[in-house]
Amino acid sequence: MTIEKNLSDVQQKYADQFQEDVVKSFQTGYGITPDTQIDAGALRREILDDQITMLTWTNEDLIFYRDISRRPAQSTVVKYDQYLRHGNVGHSRFVKEIGVAPVSDPNIRQKTVSMKYVSDTKNMSIASGLVNNIADPSQILTEDAIAVVAKTIEWASFYGDASLTSEVEGEGLEFDGLAKLIDKNNVINAKGNQLTEKHLNEAAVRIGKGFGTATDAYMPIGVHADFVNSILGRQMQLMQDNSGNVNTGYSVNGFYSSRGFIKLHGSTVMENELILDESLQPLPNAPQPAKVTATVETKQKGAFENEEDRAGLSYKVVVNSDDAQSAPSEEVTATVSNVDDGVKLSISVNAMYQQQPQFVSIYRQGKETGMYFLIKRVPVKDAQEDGTIVFVDKNETLPETADVFVGEMSPQVVHLFELLPMMKLPLAQINASITFAVLWYGALALRAPKKWARIKNVRYIAV
């Protein structure tokens, strides 16, 4: 309820005068543009805090990149030998008194590793370095380029694929990562369950049968946290600090397997590129979005064991060229009825005059988070005669899951070949700006594929 008060003429006169004085007072205000910074505000200095708050990952998050050893390379193609097997053992080595055993040679084979080229380019105007900045723009760009190249090397060390190209007999720009190099018999399917001691022991045993010793396990931090949560009910640790406060909980940084101690590493960035970021705007030279159709095919040796995973399967496809990626395709959905069904995706890619599409990335939506997770990358060279790319989803890779890589982290087993260690290269100036690139040439070498294991489809805390 509003109470109105009647003012006399004299009171009204003074009230109007007071209002006018308030309006005309010399105030600084909150304006931050010349149009709004008037009167006292025109005298106010603009203050920019000299601390830059980092809201993304840093080099400290690149655990695998920091741990792996490096070895110099002297050629774009490096060969190395693998001692696969000794000579025959057993009854054939027993002979009569004057006999000698038949000849039995060891099995040795050559392998090759092709060097790949990683680069990040930056450009800044000369004027941007002359003004009064809170930080040196050149240093900011250099540090960012180093971080981008290092992150690219780490990501490719896990998920790189040299087959992603449009050339039938060609080789893609990436080097092969652990997901491709690890022996197929050392791939353990968790089938959407959380990581357990059983999985780690199984990985250690398989690595041991390959005459290796599991020393390290790399996983997203969500997998690590879920692993810790799974054993909270069996163990409890109460700690009292100097102030008398009682704290609970603990961090599991290692696991004693049947083959020895395994250090557990939780990564904050390991799976970032496996989740579709639909907020990214395509570059001007990006390929056109793909056209996708989804049909259900029976008797495809599918693995849709959980009925809840069969209904409303949603897919999106992104087309990748060497320099850019398209916007996601329109969503296509399918529902399978049987365990062994498969979802056949027919993908049509438009050719470009400037950029040739090299591969397509196929994403499937998770039921819990609603985000789209990468389930397969298919090279354009695998296209059918009519130009369409066909992929059948047999539920081999589950959305909302991650990988755990377990293995022997020694220079004799796995390392990076480096043809060119990371360096900064100034580029030609054609205007009033400075352009430079940070380069790295090399590739991952897994000399003993059976001394590493991959635990796939591991449930984790996805954010």
Swiss-Prot record:
Keywords: Capsid protein, Virion. Its main location: virion. It comes from the Viruses. It is found in: Virion. One of its GO terms (cellular component) is viral capsid. Residues 1-24 form a propeptide. Assembles to form an icosahedral capsid. This is Major capsid protein.
